[in-house]
Amino acid sequence: HEGLRYGCAAVVAGGEVRGLVPKEKLPTYSIYYEGRTFSRGYPYQLGEHRGVPFGDLIFEFDFGVVAPEVCEDAWTTECPMRRRTYSGAELVVNISGSAFRVGTDQTRREMLITRAGDHQCTLAYVNLVGGNDGLLFDGGGFVFQNGKLMLDAPRWREGWEATTVDLDRTMRLRSENTTWRMDHT
């Protein structure tokens, strides 16, 4: 996009790419060197890439409002999830490439359940599985609705998992939570 290289989540529906959402938080620590290769997305960034919407986007579907994000974007307290849920996103989908380390699965679980509760949303998280350039990715995934575990997908294997969530419940819990309402107005 505009001569720069981004890591993006692509939203595909009805056989068409509906939008590209660039990763905002680029790690440059430990085994991660993304900041050396990629440009980061910015809050409220909007544009097009080859006729496809590009930037800080949320997507409205018949079932609800979806906000995609990429990996590290969920790991900071000032994450894009906060801005996007305050803009109406009910479902946040985080696609991740987090390498395996002992204890990381529990850390992910605790951090993501906190994010889903803090931001009064349903959060679907999926991690890469397999080996790549000497790194090992343990896969797995979670779905949390407003801080409650709805799905714990197995690690170390490819596959599909499904669960049902009630996005009306998410909206009802938001309206009942006076702290959340005050924080975002």
Show which residues each predicted segment covers.
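Enzyme catalytic cores with a strong preference for nitrogen-chemistry domains
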Residues: 1-185
